[in-house]
């Protein structure tokens, strides 16, 4: 399975969010704490669990998941997917085939058709029909079924409604599930009414479609039509086309799209119930039994509903890892049923010791997979550490007080020196490395959702994890607070999604056109310093022109009224040195693209058309137009200034776009603040400026905060105060 688009409405903080164009390989979800990143994974998990509940016939309340702003009180989760593995496609085809081909049900259905009440479908006739129908229910003929939207709607008064919607000949068709009425697995054409009630067996509709359709007479073979034939003769001849055709004269192909549209028009439903013992040996029933554990020949074994099928598909396709990895405290008891299961799909990290033993002692392909996981673990952990399994028998006391022998499975980790220690005695980092190695190797055709995978990994292991993630075969969705995990290539940054909490919910941003326009520069910035990637995790960013401001401002900010004793770290605000006024445009566009609240403090000459150089000469500001163009993008209400505009006007206009400078009649730099200038001149060796971060920090600690600095810092921190202190802007739908 692949996920292509996720939409949520009224789910926790994700009130109205859409993430489109999700990469088929690797995606990252970032942002500050409380922005809703984990809520996205929770929405996907709720969707999966809703199908599991529906498949088992239970109802699950979701009232506690409403957004606080939800009106009306309705939760919607919509995920566009494609079923791209051979197993998934064969399962969908097998379910459709099995639902339409039950011999006893066909016998009952055909008797309800006009002129066929006496028609008997013998086992031989059933075999002929099944053989033909099997050729219609193949992946090649059902390609249109493999891309669609899985949807959950929840309302307190009606409960959960689930559906899968796909396109048939340009029309939207939905499979309705988890609601009664109608029957689970009912086809319906969009739009679906609030309370659909009528439904019919799809087998009835199939036979009607084949034998009683309006244009059936046009399809009748000439050899079955005679002037003396009665209508009953013609209808029986049509039935014989499908149930008693001579060898080599199979009926023509069924237009599956047209047939499913007919099912949607007549509200046919799909379900696999009890069948004869002979039918259970057909490959379709074998596959469905392996997936579901249902023995279809046993009367009390249960039925395979549509919601149950989708629950199984989602269970096999989606792997949710925990944000906290805890190794076993002791070797696990041997369990042959868990070591050698019929269905070897791994979903739970608690099954890893059993699953690893099963593939270690499995066939050739499984042994190769075991060695790949060992190699991946060695790469991720480094230091030439590897693991292997040990099965041994130990003697321990039972609850009755008697001694008993117990077989156990232990995971042993060996380092470069040859020292071997049980995984039960290792830290969480090594266990997490093994869990990730296992799930990522087994990721082909699956969606692996990693919640904070860097939580227990030191930076070097995080960097190596990036290599492992890039080489994984499946689709990976990563929620992280670690800048070490983010890609440095600009093209891969296209699939970094940043969550920003606003007054009425979460908005989601991606770099989009900015990344394409600044491809080379973005990559250079991300590759040269992790500080740039770290900006994505903040509540806001204060941009400054150079190291002088970067050294002094963190000392003064807690002393301002808006700082109120809090440091930048307390507010999760990053102060970033852009490295010169010419770099302001790039960083402002970057922050805007990812929805990061920003403010900037620059020297007065950054917004002026001219400046005075160190020699006292007037020079033209080559970055004047570039900066003002960006400020106008950030605040369309401001007007592009003329070079003749007085500085007081420029200063006021720039502040509307979040760019601030010192409140003086003429432009000054940081060193032009009177108190700063006096301190520098009063040093044993007078200076015109503080040249380093250290000197600026020493300066800030040595003098009282100047009024000019206090005013500009109050302006910027007032703009950046994190939610809920900062007024939320009108939220628009992202990405």
Please state what every model-predicted region is.
Residues 42-149, 153-160, 221-239, 245-251:
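Conserved P-loop NTP-binding catalytic core
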Residues 23, 90, 131-134, 156-161, ...:
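Acidic, Mg2+-coordinating catalytic modules of nucleic-acid enzymes
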Residues 73-75, 320-322, 445, 474, ...:
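Short glycine-/polar-rich loops that comprise or flank the Walker A/P-loop
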Residues 212-214, 219-223, 227-238, 244-264, ...:
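Extended helical coiled-coil dimerization/tether regions that scaffold
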Residues 11-13, 24, 35, 84, ...:
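Short, solvent-exposed loop/turn segments at secondary-structure junctions
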Residues 1-59, 370-376, 397-535, 550-552, ...:
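Switch/communication elements of ASCE P-loop NTPase nucleotide-binding domains
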Residues 6, 75-79, 153-167, 178, ...:
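Short polybasic amphipathic segments
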Residues 29, 286, 324-326, 477, ...:
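Hydrophobic/aromatic beta-strand patches that form the interior of the parallel beta-sheet core
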